[in-house]
Amino acid sequence: MQTLHVELGERRYPIFIGSQLDPKQLLEPYIHGQQVMIVSNVTVAPLYLSHYQEALESLGKTVATCILPDGEKYKDIQHLNLIFDALLEAGFNRDCTVLALGGGVIGDMAGFASACFQRGVYFVQVPTTLLSQVDSSVGGKTGINHPLGKNMLGAFQQPQVVLADMAQLNTLPERELSAGLAEVIKYALLGDEDFLVWLEENMDGLVARDADLLAEAVYRSCAHKARIVANDEKEQGERALLNLGHTFGHAIESYLGYGTWLHGEAVATGMVMAADLSQRLGWISNEDVARTKKIIQRANLPISCPQIPLDDFLGYMAHDKKVLNGQLRLVLLKQLGQAVITKDFDVELMKQAILANQHG
């Protein structure tokens, strides 16, 4: 097992990364009250809920559960309310802990619920997908979608502890594994060319679910995110670099309808668009773009999206949270392994990059 700490000034919390982690031993120091609400979904709960429930009950905790439907399209205010209903019906108080057992949607919703319930209760993350292990479970961003935009309602809510268990990735569908690899590739492209070389050497093993390679990929990804979050917890500056591919990707997700494409699939094509625009701006070479596309394809991810009318695409991009004073800011590549956030780009070139990476 490897342990990584996220340092946040006065606070810090551990991320435990390994296979067949023992929840009783690892969670005990981080569950402060007697009451624990496990939030999961209909896919994950039959696989792992009893394991965590029994571990917590053996510690003398009162455990209640809230099982939600599975999918991005349920990340909304109606389903958030179901968590509040469960907490209130169980009679839970301000010392309770909300434990997220699932992927990014469950983590986002359970975390947001924990931030709101009685103005904030304890939160624990047990991410069961690769995407949530390397991205959404680290750094405290929580929230839900609104019909007019993704993640428009939310809060920063740091967990007490994160348990990333590689054994849980064995039950992950191929598509979900690939979606997680998109975020792993993102860390390499935005800040670590050595990691990109490592991914190029080991991608076949990652796709084949080699537990040791996955643990290394999760550790290196989380270490990158932890460093950035430590410097910029509330996304005032550097943390926005973690959105490489996301402004384009969110537009794809929003147009196609949440859940049609997985978040990681949309981010993968978004990173291709960002690389394409970076090349058009003269920052990276054609070879760099080809290298970006190749590693994304080797992870079984899309490098182009269906045709989306340009006005619609740009409309969704305008809703992005990185818009400042009416100006769209994009995360682009100065070179592979070095991203920048910038508003200095030619909109016509951006349109070309979008259109060049759509298929009929």
From Swiss-Prot:
EC category name: lyase
Binding site for NAD(+): 70-75, 104-108, 128-129, 141, 150
Pathway entry: Metabolic intermediate biosynthesis; chorismate biosynthesis; chorismate from D-erythrose 4-phosphate and phosphoenolpyruvate: step 2/7
Alphabetized CDD domains for the sequence: DHQS
Superkingdom per UniProt: Bacteria
Family of this protein: Belongs to the sugar phosphate cyclases superfamily. Dehydroquinate synthase family.
Name listed for the protein in its UniProt record: 3-dehydroquinate synthase
Lineage of the organism: Bacteria, Pseudomonadati, Pseudomonadota, Gammaproteobacteria, Moraxellales
